[in-house]
């Protein structure tokens, strides 16, 4: 009996040591795994950040992956032009050349088959080129803040010949500029600085935000993306709410949420290139009537940054790490993400008492 007890005790001790080793190993693994949650309103550039991580840390897009983006890019180009043409009547803008009215009819007749096949026929290419070149369409494009038009419209429409070529293969820049509405939860894993990152992107539309709660568990850091250039635009969902106001409300709810007391909060003030171009034409006061500064990129960008950072109600214990970004610029995102990773590592060490 005594021997049997001793044997059982030894086995129990061995089992306990195995469990302890497993727990230590699991604890170390969890410390090396960084869960990054990408949040922000629709059109803030979250999905482009995910693509950049694939380019920078996961080998990029091979030939087959590039080819898979062709139908989406064709759709983006066609959709942009059809939005412009539809907006002409609403904005009371006429074609400069009356013949373009027939081309507009042809555009709507030809787009369905083109989108389903993922290719632009020579006939459709001619129609699209003539419409896009018309001064009336260009005037309508210049007023795109008055209707919904993606940022990539001019990029694709200025390069229709290349995109419509039968042997067209999207470039990395084409892919970065492509736009597809994120629905559900998209995860991307990669390794950097001996850490395993799990980047989670969830849709920014109002209808998608109810899914965010499912991603909150175990979050190491949040990257909140802001569309700097959206200060004069309305939400796609209701065409009334200011995109910037919606972004500020959303950031307030995330920044001051009890879920994220010990979570690093990184603010990506994105689309700085578009803000730099737009601020020369449209004053920041259309969004912030109290703004009295110059309509320059430098002053406007800092003012917007302050609006977000001032929402932090726990400044003594919680720091916001802000970066101005251009999500389509790989070198910029690579530099910023390197700095972000260092902050995350330091904050993790502080949290576990090693710093």
UniProtKB/Swiss-Prot annotation:
Q: Identify the domain of life.
A: Eukaryota
Covalent lipid attachment of type S-palmitoyl cysteine occurs at 3
Which GO BP terms, alphabetically? adenylate cyclase-inhibiting G protein-coupled receptor signaling pathway; adenylate cyclase-modulating G protein-coupled receptor signaling pathway; G protein-coupled serotonin receptor signaling pathway; negative regulation of insulin secretion
A cellular component term, taken from the record's GO annotations: plasma membrane
Cross-referenced CDD domains, in alphabetical order?
G-alpha
The record, for SMART domains, names: G_alpha
Annotated membrane topology is:
Lipid-anchor
Q: Which residues bind GTP?
A: 40-47, 176-182, 201-205, 270-273, 327
- Covalently lipidated residues (N-myristoyl glycine) read 2
Specify where the region named G2 motif lies, as residue ranges: 174-182
What InterPro entries is this protein classified in? Gprotein_alpha_I, Gprotein_alpha_su, GproteinA_insert, P-loop_NTPase
Q: Where is this region: G4 motif?
A: 266-273
| Compositionally biased intervals (Basic and acidic residues) | 1-14
Q: Where is this region: Disordered?
A: 1-26
Location, primary (coarse class): membrane
The transmembrane segments are: none
Subcellular location(s): the record lists: Membrane
Picking any one GO molecular function of the record gives: G-protein beta/gamma-subunit complex binding
Which residues lie within the region annotated G5 motif? Answer: 325-330
Q: Per the similarity annotation, which family is this?
A: Belongs to the G-alpha family. G(i/o/t/z) subfamily.
Q: Tell me, how does this one assemble? A: G-proteins are composed of 3 units; alpha, beta and gamma. The alpha chain contains the guanine nucleotide binding site. Interacts with ADGRB2.
User: What PANTHER family does this protein map onto?
Assistant: GTP-BINDING PROTEIN ALPHA SUBUNIT, GUANINE NUCLEOTIDE-BINDING PROTEIN G(Z) SUBUNIT ALPHA
Q: What does this protein do?
A: Guanine nucleotide-binding proteins (G proteins) are involved as modulators or transducers in various transmembrane signaling systems.
Protein's name in the database: Guanine nucleotide-binding protein G(z) subunit alpha
Q: Which gene encodes it?
A: Gnaz
């Amino acid at each position: 009996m005594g021997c049997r007890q001793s044997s059982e005790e030894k086995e129990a001790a061995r089992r306990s040591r195995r469990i302890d080793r497993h727990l230590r190993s699991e604890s170390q693994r969890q410390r090396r795994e960084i869960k990054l949650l990408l949040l922000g309103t629709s059109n803030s550039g979250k999905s482009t950040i995910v693509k950049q991580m694939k380019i920078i840390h996961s080998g990029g897009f091979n030939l087959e992956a590039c080819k898979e983006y062709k139908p989406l890019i064709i759709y983006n180009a066609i959709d942009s032009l059809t939005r412009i043409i539809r907006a002409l009547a609403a904005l009371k803008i006429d074609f400069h050349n009356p013949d373009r009215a027939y081309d507009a009819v042809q555009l709507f007749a030809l787009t369905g088959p083109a989108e389903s096949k993922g290719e632009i026929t020579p006939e459709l290419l001619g129609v699209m080129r003539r419409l896009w070149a018309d001064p009336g369409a260009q005037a309508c494009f210049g007023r795109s803040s008055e209707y919904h038009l993606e940022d990539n419209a001019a990029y694709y429409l200025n390069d229709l010949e290349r995109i419509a070529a039968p042997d067209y293969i999207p470039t990395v820049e084409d892919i970065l500029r492509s736009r597809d509405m994120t629905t559900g939860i998209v995860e991307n894993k990669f390794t950097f600085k001996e850490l395993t990152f799990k980047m989670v992107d969830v849709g920014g539309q109002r209808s998608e935000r109810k899914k965010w709660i499912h991603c909150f568990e175990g979050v190491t850091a949040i990257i909140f993306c802001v569309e700097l250039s959206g200060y004069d635009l309305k939400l796609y969902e209701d065409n009334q709410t200011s995109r910037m106001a919606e972004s500020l409300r959303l950031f307030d709810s995330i920044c001051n949420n009890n879920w994220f007391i010990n979570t690093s909060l990184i603010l990506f003030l994105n689309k700085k290139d578009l803000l730099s171009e737009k601020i020369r034409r449209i004053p920041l006061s259309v969004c912030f009537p109290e703004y009295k500064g110059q309509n320059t990129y430098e002053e406007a960008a800092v003012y917007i940054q302050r609006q977000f950072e001032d929402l932090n109600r726990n400044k003594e214990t919680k720091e916001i790490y802000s970066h101005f970004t251009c999500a389509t610029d790989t070198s910029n995102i690579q530099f910023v993400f390197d700095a972000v990773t260092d902050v995350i590592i330091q904050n993790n060490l502080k949290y576990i008492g090693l710093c």
